[in-house]
Amino acid sequence: MLYAFLMTTLSLLAHDDRVTNFEQMMRLPRITETDMVSFPGGKCMMYRLYLKDKDLMNTPYSVERPEEFLSSRSIERRKRQGLPVDVTDLPVAPAYLKAVSDAGIEIVGKSKWNNTLLVRIHKEKELRKLEGLDFITQTRKVFEAPDSVTQRVRSSVRKGNNDWTSDASGEYGAAKDQLKALNGEKLHANAYRGKGLMIAVFDGGFMNVDKIPALHGIHLAGIRDFVVPESKNVFAEMEHGTMVLSTMAANLPEVYIGVAPDAQYLLVRCEDERTESLAEEDYWAEAAEYADSCGVDIINSSLGYHGFDDAKMNHHYYEQDGNTALISRSASMCADKGIVCVNSAG
């Protein structure tokens, strides 16, 4: 499920009849939905493979050489907090990856923290190709493609909305009440505007971030799409990530200024809004590991999962203990790596 953490902002702005809703204020167009189309890539399934170990006797990686798989920024963050690089930081064993690929199975994702692989097949019988690979301890179906999905098309930014300017008093424009509620004005007055920090934003897309004037000055550290890795543009789908990002990164004086306009931002798509499946937890785990390797200080995630399109995948109550679901374990591990993970609960 995709939850917004914007309720505070929305309620603070609701009293102002000049801004009928947050979408209008940020000049965001509605997404155009067209006819149903076949699921991209055709009918397929994805399975999560659990691996027994990191093959420490043969792996080329070592915790003594973290610079081979972590950025200097990530290593420094650990050192600053007295946190060691451990075996969970080591990449998935290359020999295991090769064996799965050589068996004719397509690998679409991997998690070093959880020591798992995400693979895609088109027929159940293809799993037989993995028989005899003793390093695979368990398999779990995490996705089955629906017959069709709604096609979503990027809308253009409406010029009329971009011409909108705030008559709210002061530098912060329509964000004034939001900043005041968070004591942001005092922080900004003391030069705490996010400079030196890197923040990763996890969402389902960032439509038109590249076109909205208030976001033109964003300090963009990187972009990654774990749902459609070959995608050329995460700015073409889903406006929710744009809204979340704007509350932090927008910087257009007298119109809207976010709480941390001087921070660097890593934009990551790990939510597939077309479907709900356990595979999205694998995407999230990959996103967290990518953010860690880039050296982020904070992860802002607007994602959480409980019920799925296939009810057999739904999490039971006893699984909701913070230790069972793959995404929960991954979120907890962020703290082990020195990252503050903030997730919505809307």
Describe the role of every protein-language-model region.
Residues 49-53, 121-122, 142, 201-205, ...:
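Active-site-proximal beta-strand/loop segments in catalytic clefts of secreted hydrolases
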Residues 42, 175, 185-225, 230-280, ...:
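Subtilisin-like serine protease catalytic core
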Residues 1-20:
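Bacterial Sec-dependent N-terminal signal peptides
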Residues 60-62, 141, 149-154, 209-216, ...:
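Short, solvent-exposed loop/turn and secondary-structure capping segments
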Residues 15-102, 106, 124-150:
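Primarily auto-inhibitory N-terminal propeptides
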Residues 296-346:
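Catalytic-core segments of hydrolase enzymes
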